């Protein structure tokens, strides 16, 4: 027992231990409100996907749902607008819900026709202003027309958003030539100077999406400009085992000593 006790003592002196590293990832996500044009002109079929003509709304759904999927750490919300504005989804990390809402979009969801860009910016900014502790807040405005409705002008709404620290990225969708829809040539009344000014006032950027390639490129560019901040921390946990060996060794040594003491003396 004493010999075995010495073995355990030597093991204790070697300081056996178990080392485990745990990595923790902390992400400071961005709050993103997407202002989605649902006016009737979004049904203009002047975009092409997989060699098939599609309308602007279908193109927007395709590109935006992909963008949502690419931002797992960001809270995303949706406002839709035509002649009026409607909030469809508050800021959420439930991106399956966001994309489900987007896929159900159609122009007749908002009965008032027109393009209320200022009201859409104001509604989106109100949602973002509720999030006081978020480091980065942005609005992505997707539209195919000039503002012709609403209670507030686009530039005033943009100035108010800028005061709240909100950046606005504007995307003009569609071709100036338009295309045939229901036997009629449909053209868009783009107001790109205003869209550029909205972006400029808030520190954002303006993009023009005349086809699927440029539409995708716009959202890719926004994704590169607006990155979530991730911090990775590694914590090392060390569990010492020497005490187990030391106690066991001491116990065995004591047992060996006790056995020697209790061992009967040899017969004379």
Protein language model features and the residues they cover:
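Short, charged loop segments at secondary-structure junctions
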Residues: 36, 42-45, 84-118, 198-201
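Short beta-strand-loop
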Residues: 72-105, 125-130, 179-196, 218-221
């Amino acid at each position: 027992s004493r010999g075995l006790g010495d073995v355990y003592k030597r093991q204790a002196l070697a300081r056996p231990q178990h080392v485990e590293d745990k990595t923790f990832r902390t992400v400071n996500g961005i709050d993103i409100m997407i202002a989605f044009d649902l006016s009737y002109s979004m049904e203009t079929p002047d975009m092409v996907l997989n060699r098939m003509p599609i309308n602007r709304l279908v193109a927007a759904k395709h590109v935006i749902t992909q963008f949502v999927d690419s931002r797992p750490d960001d809270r995303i919300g949706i406002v839709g607008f035509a002649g009026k504005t409607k909030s469809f989804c508050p800021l959420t990390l439930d991106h399956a819900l966001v994309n489900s809402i987007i896929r159900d979009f159609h122009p007749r969801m908002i009965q008032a026709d027109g393009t209320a860009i200022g009201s859409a910016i104001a509604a989106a900014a109100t949602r973002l202003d509720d999030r006081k502790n978020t480091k980065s807040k942005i609005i992505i405005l997707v539209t195919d027309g000039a503002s012709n409705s609403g209670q507030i002008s686009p530039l005033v709404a943009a100035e108010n958003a800028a005061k709240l620290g909100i950046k606005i990225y504007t995307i003009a969708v569609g071709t100036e030539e338009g295309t045939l829809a229901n036997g009629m040539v449909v053209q868009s009344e783009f107001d790109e100077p205003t869209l550029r000014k909205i972006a400029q006032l808030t520190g954002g950027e303006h993009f023009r999406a005349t086809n699927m390639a440029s539409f995708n490129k716009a959202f890719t560019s926004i994704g590169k400009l607006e990155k979530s901040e991730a911090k990775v921390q590694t914590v090392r946990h060390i569990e010492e085992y020497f005490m187990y060996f030391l106690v066991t060794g001491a116990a065995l040594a004591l047992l060996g000593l006790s056995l020697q003491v209790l061992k009967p003396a040899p017969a004379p």
